[in-house]
Amino acid sequence: MGRILKAILGQLSFFTIIPSPSASLEEIAEFSFISPLMVGIITGIIDWFVVLLGIRLIGSLGALLLIPTVEIIRGFHHLDGLLDMGDALMVGKERRPQVLHDLQTGSGAIGLFLVYFSIFLIATLNLNVSNLWFFLPSEVLARASAISLLGLMKPIPGSYLGKVFHDKMRDKLFSIKFLLVQVFAILFSSPVLILAYVILLLVFYLMAKLVFDGMSGDIVGAIITLSFPIYLLVAEKTCYHYFIFQYSLTLP
């Protein structure tokens, strides 16, 4: 198997628990710009199928199956990053890099988890129908947000994963890689979703810059985790593909 194909397929094994050929961290980092599209599409299809099956089997509450499905597919790794970031937000700036890497769970982690879970719960309870165009852009945008900032911002001290990904992204092809990530981000998105993407990208950039002064693997996981239900909520209300389909059903 070619090195490039192996590195591309390795995105799945790195960002999810989906079985796929593994690659070195450096190879995965070098081609991480493809992960929003590749991983996003596959996980988006899984999300859609689970919600579709859940709604058909047990009614609208079947959409709640999306919450454990998303976390299981991610192997709970991104959720761990969210919890670590929650704890880090509660301490002084000097201790934040250290808290990001410790194994303890404090009140900050619980608080940020409750914020995330509340948004996700609202988003799933609003799902009266399983439409693929709700899930594809949400998965792709969440990952594009994190990968974009990983390339733009320097790693925080002590973040080996952040340094490897940043260095591999910031090569001579960085402009092309960054542009491709943005193309992937808007590929399945409505205008309102694109606006939400720009706003969240700015919010997360300012947070990472002012609070942590850089990026790390935990912050990447936190961004993917927290932004996904927000994008999903926006997609449910603004997905023009869905509304065009609904309108077409009313035509004679």
Curated annotation (Swiss-Prot):
Listed GO MF terms: adenosylcobinamide-GDP ribazoletransferase activity; cobalamin 5'-phosphate synthase activity
Keyword Kinase: no
Enzyme class: transferase
Protein localization: Cell membrane
GO terms for cellular component: plasma membrane
Required cofactor(s): Mg(2+)
Name of this chain's protein: Adenosylcobinamide-GDP ribazoletransferase
Source organism per UniProt: Sulfolobus acidocaldarius (strain ATCC 33909 / DSM 639 / JCM 8929 / NBRC 15157 / NCIMB 11770)
